[in-house]
Amino acid sequence: MSYEFDENFDVIVVGAGHAGVEASLAAARMGCKVLLATINLEMLAFMPCNPSIGGSAKGIVVREIDALGGEMGKNIDKTYIQMKMLNTGKGPAVRALRAQADKALYAMTMKHTVECQENLTLRQSMVDEILVEDSKVVGVRTATNQKYGAKAVVVTTGTALRGEIIIGDLKYSSGPNNSLASVTLADNLKELGLEIGRFKTGTPPRVKASSINYEETEIQPGDEKPNHFSFLSKDEDYLQDQIPCWLTYTNQESHDIINNNLHRAPMFSGIVKGVGPRYCPSIEDKIVRFADKNRHQLFLEPEGRETEEVYVQGLSTSLPEDVQKELIHSIKGLEKAEMIRTGYAIEYDIVLPHQLRATLETKLISGLFTAGQTNGTSGYEEAAGQGLVAGINAALKVQGKPELILKRSDAYIGVMIDDLVTKGTLEPYRLLTSRAEYRLILRHDNADMRLTPIGREVGLVDDERWNIFKIKKNQFDRELTRLSKEKLKPIKETNEKIQALGFKPLTDAMTAKEFMRRPEIDYATATQFVGPAAEDLDAKVIELLETEIKYEGYINKALDQVAKMKRMEEKKIPENIDWDAIDSIATEARQKFKKINPETIGQASRISGVNPADISILMVYLEGNNKARRKVD
């Protein structure tokens, strides 16, 4: 069947949440003609749940998005009300930035960026159907029967896909924050042959700031020391007038209220059918699962400068409204709090991610990509990271250029995508530092060193960003070389100076770099002995130098592991392989291989239920086939 289109585009993005805006901006900046279609323009880049960006692992993802040329980091740096570096007392691998956002300003600023982007058309429109011919995407059809042609379509519908909001016994069709649900498109994706799952997430009630007794809570201020998500942001623009958050706790009375009303909780009454997030459970789930805990932390997070709404982080719930009010009033500082919005659960459809390639293109339909919560993840940052990769690959496909696959050793975004397409997910997927085996080389401070050259290669990093990156890289390389050459000798004058600083004297000559490997020696101390750099170094360059030098041994071990895995990743598996023709592999492995259809030996080795013996048999089989082909040739 051929279609007559009202308008033609290179790439169409369906849904303008955090995944959709990154996908559409990336494709447009790479030179494609892009349509971004969304149900409600007022929901563009909206934060329906927590009013924050970043956090453990997630903050590193935002830095990665920025390093590649994405928008989230720049946008939050313009609109935050508080900034805080987490895990500063721990090693560099787990440090991550978190910002409290001005929720309305964040969405408004991102909307303006999208509206001003060259090559990008923004349209309020509900897409009801993905149009396909011969297993290839050709466009979309809207609810108003407009047909738009495209060579690639990226679906980023989030929790709107057959969304249903649940509060107590009440259940109704809705996307997040009472927006319209996308039901017809959900039916269409299933009709196209995609396997669909059903997940659930939730959000806490919001209370009025002026009704909170802050004297009964603990203040949580932001950092005075400048930190930014974007590598383009400047320290002189760092916000000093930050708004604090506040800490309080549930108590025994709170827990009794929940336990006495579990029969009315949708999670336990059978109303909620979708699988909820393990790492962000509802308060009723926490009380049941952790019955031995006598209290749980709650953070009171302002939603912006020009609003009275305060987000009660840690109190996600779908309990009936009257129970939510009673629960809030049992909490210290909230005894007289006015509830502005009730918490709710939302169930929604997802595309089971084992059906995707590492580019986020579906295996079933050429040119159809999915990203964000549509793929079963949770969180704005995870969504934005996927949206960026999907948008880049949609543009590359249209342009006939090689695809971009971020490896596990490249980025947390690569870890997430590999987890999704290789292992799938049975619950809303959240990124954690523990998921990354190479986390010491996937740090907050080196995201640009890892990814900006990749962003430049695909055409997403502009000249301004590239020049800033080159200056930093050149400074780092020159100073590392100098520190590797400059020597300290165990002479009397040097040792007296070292001892005066309270450190152990030298017994042998060593380079300044070797001297800095001592835990107590920082860059400033080392330069007291070898002199300063020939140029003023940026503080971020110094931070990077200290980390790379002090952890060099561990970093080199990680790089050795990366090299070994690279050899596995380079061993491709033919797309048309007959898994039934391979003798001796375990039944479970055969079933998993058929379901996931891994593209490389490396990916095959990471599938759960596949053991090393199965991989060895697979490699022998592939080598035998290669030899047979060589003889024929």
Curated annotation (Swiss-Prot):
SUPFAM superfamilies: FAD/NAD(P)-binding domain. It is found in: Cytoplasm. FAD binds at residues 15-20, 127, 182, 373. GO terms for molecular function: flavin adenine dinucleotide binding. NAD-binding protein involved in the addition of a carboxymethylaminomethyl (cmnm) group at the wobble position (U34) of certain tRNAs, forming tRNA-cmnm(5)s(2)U34. Homodimer. Heterotetramer of two MnmE and two MnmG subunits. This is tRNA uridine 5-carboxymethylaminomethyl modification enzyme MnmG. The gene is mnmG.
